[in-house]
A protein has these predicted regions:
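Short hydrophobic alpha-helices and adjacent helix-cap/hinge residues
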Residues: 1-199
Length: 199
């Protein structure tokens, strides 16, 4: 095996766990990874490179401000608290967005029926940023098409933005999105560079 392309956080976790036993001298490159600790661990190896996945929340919020002047509330919908914790830890965000209210719906903490209830409570002067809302307490995985249909049906024409290119389905405006094709291309180029330097 000449090299390994690693495509998400679970895959990188597996790679790091078994690196010494299975992948010791095999070059690797990752993409679609947002766990900073695992990225730091991986990059300690000389034959590992990669691309961190970073959501462009500032650009999406600016698009909302520009195109939806009535918006006072932004509701983030996400699997877990990772993005929320990073966003709320930034003092810059508190200053930049002092005129906006931010709310979070964390899907891992609720069942799908509760999700519908939370969506019905979203006020008309809101916009939604859909991050990674595909896991619930009672459902391990729902596709973005199903999630976005639900959001659209229960939020009464509130603008919906996404952070992933494949999160743009019917009813979703878009936004400054992450494109995993482009990330994988960059990661592949890095991997080839490592392989070619070693041979």
């Amino acid at each position: 095996m000449e090299g390994i392309l690693i495509g998400d956080d679970d895959a990188l976790e597996f790679y790091l766990k078994y690196k010494e036993d299975l992948f010791k001298d095999i070059p690797a490159s990752f993409f679609g990874i947002y766990d900073k600790k695992n990225i730091e661990r991986a990059l300690k190896y000389k034959n590992v490179a990669g691309v961190r996945e970073v959501e462009s929340l500032d650009q999406i919020i600016e698009l909302i401000r520009k195109h939806h002047k009535n918006v006072e509330n932004i509701v983030f919908i996400d699997n877990d608290n990772r993005v929320k914790n990073e966003f709320e830890a930034s003092e810059d965000n508190a200053l930049k967005y002092s005129n906006l209210n931010f709310e979070w719906i964390i899907t891992n903490d609720i069942v799908s029926d509760e999700f519908v209830h939370e969506l019905k409570k979203v006020e008309e002067n809101s916009a939604i940023i859909s991050l990674y809302p595909i896991h619930f307490k009672d459902v391990k995985w729902l596709g973005y098409d199903d999630i976005n249909k639900g959001i659209k049906n229960y939020t009464n024409q509130i603008p919906i933005y996404a952070c992933l290119s494949y999160g743009i389905t019917e009813g979703v405006i878009g936004g400054k999105v992450i494109n995993h094709y482009n990330q994988s291309k960059s990661a592949t180029e890095m991997l080839l560079k490592i392989i070619n330097e070693e041979t």
